[in-house]
Amino acid sequence: MNRGFSRKSHTFLPKIFFRKMSSSGAKDKPELQFPFLQDEDTVATLLECKTLFILRGLPGSGKSTLARVIVDKYRDGTKMVSADAYKITPGARGAFSEEYKRLDEDLAAYCRRRDIRILVLDDTNHERERLEQLFEMADQYQYQVVLVEPKTAWRLDCAQLKEKNQWQLSADDLKKLKPGLEKDFLPLYFGWFLTKKSSETLRKAGQVFLEELGNHKAFKKELRQFVPGDEPREKMDLVTYFGKRPPGVLHCTTKFCDYGKAPGAEEYAQQDVLKKSYSKAFTLTISALFVTPKTTGARVELSEQQLQLWPSDVDKLSPTDNLPRGSRAHITLGCAADVEAVQTGLDLLEILRQEKGGSRGEEVGELSRGKLYSLGNGRWMLTLAKNMEVRAIFTGYYGKGKPVPTQGSRKGGALQSCTII
């Protein structure tokens, strides 16, 4: 008689054997078709990031099963925090303020640990106010956020969920929770968020560029573009000048959504290509670094696949512009005082519009990474001799984009607060 396999009857088999069995079975289940479970390149990339998976859904919809699959997939460096463990009944949070306080304290403690890269929060998360608290915590500890909702066929069917949920909630109880989960929760913006390693590599390249440019004789002749008034200056520290720098990991914005209020945000978020790409790993190509009196950034050359995620209406400074799609793709590396990060993309479009008009500027020499061009009006472009490739996860930024106290795992560091730009 074939008794089949069981962990109990085959104690001599290594754990990896059973992990492969479970992962191969997951590939056949439509409710587990997520890039972070199915795409090994994405799995490897996420292990280089700090990611908070926030599960959302009605009781009985399959959140806990999905949470366990995520933990099983990533294993080491992963922790799950479940509302069930704190005896929190799904519904209004007011009756469980002490329980949520303990949950948040434990979640924050995990965020502070250096050995944890993946955090999984299992709760209904149907209230905007609650989600905003979690997004602020993610900002504080510099975690990227991935919102995950079960794909089970019954996830919004209160009649079926009544039978499946462990809390014995009635169909009416479930219907009260449903409105907050029927609509997608849109971020402040979507984009590609670089891994920690890629962020550090690009940030370092940007800093070397600023140091070399600041010492270049051609730049010294044009200092008046960066120094106010008639203040005499023979040299300037561009690293200090662009002191308003993105904390944590760098990113390349695709669509500014303003939580769904921006024009075209809902339509953008409903695209099939976005839904399939959300939480997926990509490799971005950097072809140039640039400086203007207001910003410094990296130009991103998007592939055909990546261009599918690029909005069709963001590559123009004026209605008559006809720049190629993806022209504005960039990564902000720093801004001058009182300059917002949105200016970086506008500066890049100005440079590319000038190039299209036939003026690439004057080649003034070579730096360690490529040729330096002076474009006039304090604008400089370093065309890389060898393109840089950076790894990134496509997701959303859901926080407020305002300064919050940061508590990274590194000791020291210049940044005392986190401003997402």
From Swiss-Prot:
The modification Cysteine methyl ester is found at residue 418. It catalyses: a nucleoside 2',3'-cyclic phosphate + H2O = a nucleoside 2'-phosphate + H(+). It is a lipid-anchor. Transmembrane segments: none annotated. One of its GO terms (cellular component) is melanosome. GO terms for molecular function: 2',3'-cyclic-nucleotide 3'-phosphodiesterase activity; RNA binding. Keywords: Hydrolase, Leukodystrophy, Lipoprotein, Membrane, Methylation, Neurodegeneration, Phosphoprotein, Prenylation, RNA-binding. Substrate binds at residues 253, 332. The modification Phosphotyrosine is found at residue 110. Residues 419-421 form a propeptide. Its EC number is 3.1.4.37. It is an enzyme of class 3 (hydrolase). One of its GO terms (biological process) is adult locomotory behavior. It holds the Pfam family CNPase. The active site is at 251 (proton acceptor), 330 (proton donor). Changing residue 82 to L: In HLD20; uncertain significance; decreased protein levels in patient cells. It is found in: Membrane; Melanosome. The modification Phosphoserine is found at residues 6, 9, 170, 359. It is linked to Leukodystrophy, hypomyelinating, 20: An autosomal recessive disorder characterized by neuroregression and loss of motor, language and cognitive skills, after a normal early development. Disease onset is between 12 and 18 month of age. Patients show poor overall growth, microcephaly, feeding difficulties and spastic quadriplegia. Some patients may have seizures. Death in childhood may occur. Hypomyelinating leukodystrophy with subcortical and periventricular white matter abnormalities is seen on brain imaging. Exists as monomers and homodimers. Belongs to the 2H phosphoesterase superfamily. CNPase family. Catalyzes the formation of 2'-nucleotide products from 2',3'-cyclic substrates. May participate in RNA metabolism in the myelinating cell, CNP is the third most abundant protein in central nervous system myelin. This is 2',3'-cyclic-nucleotide 3'-phosphodiesterase. It comes from Homo sapiens (Human).
